[in-house]
Amino acid sequence: LKYEFENIFPGCRLLDIHEYLFEKGLTLPDKGQKYLYHEPCHTPMKQYSSIKVAETLLSAEVKMSDRCCGEAGTFSVSRPDIAAQVRYRKEHELKSNLLEFDETPAKILTSCPACQQGLSRYESATALETDYIVVEMVKQHLGDEWSKAFTHQVLNGGMENILL
C-alpha cells in the first residue's frame, strides 16, 4: 500500500503532531527530567529523528528503548504465543535501559496508541508510567487535570471557544 497524499493534496506535507510542534519551536522549560522513548515499529515521525524531536520538545534527556513492545495492533491477540516472547524481551530491554540512568526516568514515552497500551503492561515490573510525548507536554504546561478541564470546556462552550 502506497500513500499518495502528494497527488491528493499537492504542496502539502504529512507531519506527525510532534514534528509540527518541533518545527514551530515549542519547548517546555528544562526541569531536569529524564525519559525513555519507545519508537513504534511504524513510527509516525518521518521528517526528523524522534529522539531529537522528543529531547527538544521536552527540554530533557531522552534515551531510546529499542525492541517491539509486543502489542502491534492485533498481533497480541492473533499470535499471543509470539507476542508473549516479544514482551518478555522488551521487559528485559526496559530493565536494562533503567540501569543507564542515575535515577528512575519520569516515564516511557511513545507516539503510538497501540504501543502505549502495550507499554502499560510493563508498569508493575519497571515502575514506569507510559504516555504520549504531546500529552506529557500538556500535563506539564496545564497540570494533571487538563483533560477534565478540556472536556468541560468542549461540553459547555464548544471547540471554537477553546481554539479561539
Annotate each language-model stretch with its function:
Residues 1-164:
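Iron-sulfur cluster-binding electron-transfer modules in prokaryotic oxidoreductases
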